[in-house]
Amino acid sequence: LVVDKEKPEEEIGRVLRKLKQMKQDKNTLIIFISDNGAEGGRGAVSRSRGNYSVGDPGSYEVQNKYWSQTGNAPFREYKGICYEGGISAPLIAWFPGKIKKGRIVKGVGHLIDLAPTFYDLAGAEYPTEYNGVKTNALPGKSLLPILFGGKEVV
């Protein structure tokens, strides 16, 4: 599910209502991840804004690099720069009865950790072979010890 960035609370609410209607709300892990870092302003590629108002067709407006850093506070810099403000993305996980409410973990994970997490949650094993062809090893580690337990690192 991809959520519209303009109204994420409505889209997530719609999903939660549907899960409740299906009686699966207490049996579903929901993970919400945003994009990394704020836009850092105009780079080497410049697009002419013309005489348009911001938001009109043909307009192109971005915040400058100084405002971008405020959008990434408390982290330094912005998208395209390898400081935390440019590479970090928050992850919010929800699973009633499994994940403690209000807990904040300052550990590090990666998108490659999601597939091992889902396999672990489902009690499934990643196949070593598929249709007679050996598969590559699954990268990443399960995040369940962090999500369900008290661990900060896996």
Where do the protein language model's features map onto the residues?
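Short acidic-aromatic active-site loops that bind/stabilize oxyanions
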Residues: 1-6, 82
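Histidine-centered active-site microenvironments of extracellular/periplasmic hydrolases
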Residues: 20-94
